[in-house]
């Protein structure tokens, strides 16, 4: 992302916060239905945010496991994003087409640019994305999530007779 080094909006904040600074995003409509999608955003300081979109509504409570790395240099900043197939759901088909979008927000100007033009006045933002073709022979991974927990129960009865002798 070519930018004046001194004007890059970047500060460290918590995950899923701080999207009021320079960021890059990639979005996938994995079922190519124009309604449901996944969006991954990364700021210049490598703060991640991810969300699911459904009918133009955001679910920011969703958290996927993915990686990103950013680098700020004399020309601006660059980003590398790794999103494993296990982070998203997609159909079990030998040949797939997904919706795809890239975007960039520049804080100092309030500018938001997208790879595929989007008319914000028109509903169905995801339906306006480009098409990613050529995804072949990718099987949806097995998903299993385990949450460990412990449960206990304690039952005590008091005897009215208190003795100091041990009984067997």
Predicted regions: what they are:
Residues 3-160, 164:
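Structural preference for beta-rich elements and adjacent junctions enriched in aromatics
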Residues 166-168:
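Hydrophobic alpha-helical segments, chiefly the membrane-spanning helices
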């Amino acid at each position: 992302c070519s930018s004046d080094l001194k004007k890059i909006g970047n500060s460290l904040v918590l995950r899923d916060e701080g999207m009021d600074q320079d960021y890059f995003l990639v979005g996938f409509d994995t079922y190519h239905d124009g309604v449901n999608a996944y969006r991954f955003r990364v700021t210049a300081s490598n703060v991640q945010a991810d969300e699911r979109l459904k009918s133009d509504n955001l679910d920011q409570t969703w958290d996927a496991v993915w990686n990103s790395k950013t680098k700020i240099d004399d020309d601006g900043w660059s980003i590398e994003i790794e999103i494993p197939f296990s982070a998203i759901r997609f159909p079990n088909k030998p040949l797939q087409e997904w919706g795809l979008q890239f975007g960039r927000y520049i804080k100092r100007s309030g500018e938001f640019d997208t790879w595929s033009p989007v008319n914000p006045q028109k509903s169905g933002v995801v339906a306006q994305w480009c098409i990613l073709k050529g995804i072949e022979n990718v099987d949806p991974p097995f998903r299993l999530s385990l949450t460990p927990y412990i449960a206990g129960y304690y039952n005590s009865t008091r005897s009215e007779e208190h003795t100091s002798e041990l009984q067997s």
